[in-house]
Amino acid sequence: MARLLRSATWELFPWRGYCSQKAKGELCRDFVEALKAVVGGSHVSTAAVVREQHGRDESVHRCEPPDAVVWPQNVEQVSRLAALCYRQGVPIIPFGTGTGLEGGVCAVQGGVCVNLTHMDRILELNQEDFSVVVEPGVTRKALNAHLRDSGLWFPVDPGADASLCGMAATGASGTNAVRYGTMRDNVLNLEVVLPDGRLLHTAGRGRHFRFGFWPEIPHHTAWYSPCVSLGRRKSAAGYNLTGLFVGSEGTLGLITATTLRLHPAPEATVAATCAFPSVQAAVDSTVHILQAAVPVARIEFLDEVMMDACNRYSKLNCLVAPTLFLEFHGSQQALEEQLQRTEEIVQQNGASDFSWAKEAEERSRLWTARHNAWYAALATRPGCKGYSTDVCVPISRLPEIVVQTKEDLNASGLTGSIVGHVGDGNFHCILLVNPDDAEELGRVKAFAEQLGRRALALHGTCTGEHGIGMGKRQLLQEEVGAVGVETMRQLKAVLDPQGLMNPGKVL
């Protein structure tokens, strides 16, 4: 199929080099007409305002607009676009919802932005196999709305309502990661258009398998292990190509469909909040809860600055203090056991104001506030942008790094707060910065680099879920080493020899 599509594109424009790319912002007329021939004239734009909208995300990186924006309607058109750009040496930048935090959509070398939001179909739901196939325009909220009456749900939930293929591209995570894992644990297969237009199914066409295996355990089991797999799906067939493309940030190909692992909706759910006298006490409680093998589904930390911002933005009435938001899934009996054990642990660490949220509306209000923490922080300093760090460390080192980071933040003179998915060792400093103030921006970046190196020194990572993007490339080299980076470069060179896929990111 991909070969036929590529041949069709070449027949439309049979001579190589018909359009040598001009300076950034200037694709020649023939090339723009070629784009229109693939997707239709109404699905191509070179308007400055449209290009600028597609040259920025929610990061502090300055806008780098593409030369043109295209909206393909199906995978065949994506394949033809890739083949066309490959033949002419024009960079391609994938675009989903634009909610990334690392400058992943910035067109640093110009080129064509491929906006995939018009491809928004849920292609196949396999309830018996706990899997679903979605196109790149489907967001996590849209998928879960579609699944509402099926008894299944997809748990990976970053703060923004991101596109699911975009989440796969960045290796995203969320508040449920402590129990259900990240995108790396929940992607079974990917359909990828390679830089030259060929079509790849990373686990084979139509297959709903993954590498690795977890035993089958009933979902209602009280002490339920994270990342349990319902239905034995495993494969040892060759290299794990799915794992290669998850987290590749659009640098190896365009993800045009993903097969996701679904989970049974829990029988019962209870959320809880509790406040602490100090950051140390809150984070210590997190470690103790996990070490006690309480199968918490969510455990989120908000420092007192973030708690105050969330109270104001989301109209909560929580105590302004370091706080944990928790959620438990299971049978009614299991929940009672989990809540009792958790309350004992947090009280030993000085917790107060322990409250339960059993009703769905009350829980939704609580977790909506948590998901809106980024916007709550931005609202405290209007006109500024946010910079979010993203380190992740082994759970045993979490109290050390969070407490030290809080002390550094207080001493820095910067405006910021701490929030995070502490159940898996991942937390964020959300720093507010005037992007036009070079001195302040420099201090923010220095703070972030120092924190990244501290995480590496504690055997952690510089990014748990946001990706490398433009800003963490040096930290990536320090994390994986020279041989690791060179191996990545070699893989990139084989798949994308011209370096056209989302240039300037990761490597």
Swiss-Prot record:
Tissue expr: Expressed moderately in heart and liver and at lower levels in skeletal muscle and kidney.
Keyword flag Oxidoreductase: yes
A GO MF label: FAD binding
Primary location class: mitochondrion
Cofactor: FAD
Domain FAD-binding PCMH-type: 62-265
Transit peptide range per the UniProt entry: 1-52
Modified positions (N6-succinyllysine) in chain numbering: K358
Protein name per its UniProtKB record: Probable D-lactate dehydrogenase, mitochondrial
Gene from which the chain derives: LDHD
